Amino acid sequence: MDCVESYLSGDNSDESPVMHTWFSPSPSPSDSSSSPSSSASSSIGRNSDDGEKSSEDGGDDAGENEVESPYKGPLEMMESLEQVLPVRKGISKYYSGKSKSFTNLTAEAASALTSSSSMKDLAKPENPYSRRRRNLLCHQIWENNKTTPRGGISKKHVMSSSRSALTLAMAVAAGVMTGEGSSSGGDSSPGSSPTTSGSPPRQLHHHQHQMKKLPPLYPRSQGSFGNLTSSQSSLGFCAWRSFSVADFPRCFPATASGIGFNDS
C-alpha cells in the first residue's frame, strides 16, 4: 500500500481518480500465497471448508449413535430373526405365534399325532350349519342324477311306447269294423247265400276305394312301415297315415255313422 500512496502523491491532480485505480499495481503471487488470511477470507473457500467439517462431524456422530443388536449368534431360526429385525410392535403382536418356521410346524404336527386325541384336534369342528349344508348338497346331487336322462335310451323307450299305443288304437278300430261287418252278415236272410259269399270282395273293393280318397303316405312312413302296411291291408287295417278329424268318417264309416258323422 505504500507504493500505491507514493504513486498517487507523485501524480498530477488533474488526472481523474479512475486512472489512479486503473493503473494501481496488483499484488504479486508471492504476497497472496504468504498471506493466509486472504485465502481464509474468501467466501467460497470458507463455505467449502465449513461443509467438509460439518460432514466429518456428522459421520463421527452417526458412528457414535449406531445401534448394534445384542444378539451375536447365527440367524437360523425365526425367533432369532424376530429379535434382531426392527419390526413394529403392532405387527409383531398381530403375527405373534403365526409366522413361524416350518421346523416348528413339523414338530407340532408330530407331537399332535403322537398324542391320544390327535384326530379330534386335527379334525374340523362341525356345527349344525355345516351339517345342514352337506345334507342339502348330497340331496341336490341325488335329485339331479334321478331326473337327468341318460343318452338315447329314454328317447327310444318313448318312441316304442307311442308306437305301441298307436298300434293298440288301430287294432281296436279294426275290431269294431270287423264286429259290425259280421253282425250285418248275420242279419241277412238265409236265402241270399250268393250275396254273403260275395261280401268279402265287396268289402275289399270298398276298402280300396276309401284308400284312394285318403291323402298320400309320407315317404318315411312308406319305407319304415311298408311291411306292416301290407300285412294290415289284408286284415282290413288302415295304412299308417297322419289323420285328422275330417278323415275319420272316411276311414271308419260304420263307427262315424254310429257316432253321428256324415260322409263328406
Swiss-Prot record:
Comp. bias (Basic and acidic residues): 47-56
Residue stretches in coiled coil: none
Compartmental location: Nucleus
Biased composition (Acidic residues): 57-67
UniProt-annotated stretches for the region Disordered: 1-76, 178-225
Keyword Kinase listed: yes
Biased composition annotated in UniProt, kind: Low complexity: 29-43, 179-201
Keywords: Kinase, Nucleus, Stress response, Transferase
GO molecular function, one term: kinase activity
One BP term from GO: response to oxidative stress
Cellular component GO terms, alphabetical: nucleus
Keyword Nucleus in annotation: yes
Residue ranges with Basic residues bias: 203-212
Protein task: Promotes slightly the tolerance to zinc (Zn) and to oxidizing chemicals (e.g. diamide).
Protein name as annotated: Protein OXIDATIVE STRESS 3 LIKE 1
Organism: Arabidopsis thaliana
Lineage: Eukaryota, Viridiplantae, Streptophyta, Embryophyta, Tracheophyta
Gene this protein is translated from: O3L1
